[in-house]
Amino acid sequence: MEQGTEGHWLHGGMTFDPSQYHRFEHGKMQCGLCVASWQLTDVQEGDGGFACIPGSHKSNYRPLSQMLSTKNDLGTVKQISAKAGAVIIFNEALVHGTLPWKPENRMRRSILFKCSPGFLSWGGPSKCPIADPTPEELAVYESPHRTGRVTLEGQETS
């Protein structure tokens, strides 16, 4: 983002979308689409950029429209500051968006990595680039599907 770039409205977690969820039951947390936003430049308090309503991913109710406005400061929207190299991790059930970028002397740059459970994906399958892959390696490259998936368990190696 360059100075003067307008923000992006607050979204996520506001209506039922089967890809945007956060659930904790029976000792396990489950969530839908997740994002890791790797900051390539410093973002200081008051700069703008990524903002969210902390804890909103756990809400069972749609926030009031007044709470979703970035124009009126009701104290619900928090801009996240981070140094270059930091990673902000959140799931799409979190109400989030982007505040207008204010600094004149630097741009905002970040790389977003998006992940989802295997049964929920917006992309197609990838071809396995490994020559003679193991069944476990092939499982990583399977196309998204819900039933009959191979479950990979962590194994210690020496």
PLM regions: where:
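Residue-level signature for short turns and capping positions that connect secondary-structure elements
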Residues: G7, T15, H57-K58, V95, ...
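Active-site donor-binding loop signature of nucleotide-sugar glycosyltransferases
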Residues: G12, G55, C115
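Short aromatic-enriched loop/helix-cap "lid" or pocket-rim segments at secondary-structure transitions
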Residues: T5-W9, G48-F50, R62-S65, W122-K127
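Non-heme Fe(II)/2-oxoglutarate
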Residues: V87, L94-S158
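Conserved double-stranded beta-helix
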Residues: M1-A51
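Double-stranded beta-helix
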Residues: Q30-V35, D42-L99
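Short, surface-exposed loop/helix-turn segments at secondary-structure junctions
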Residues: H11-Q20, S65-T76, N105, S126-A131
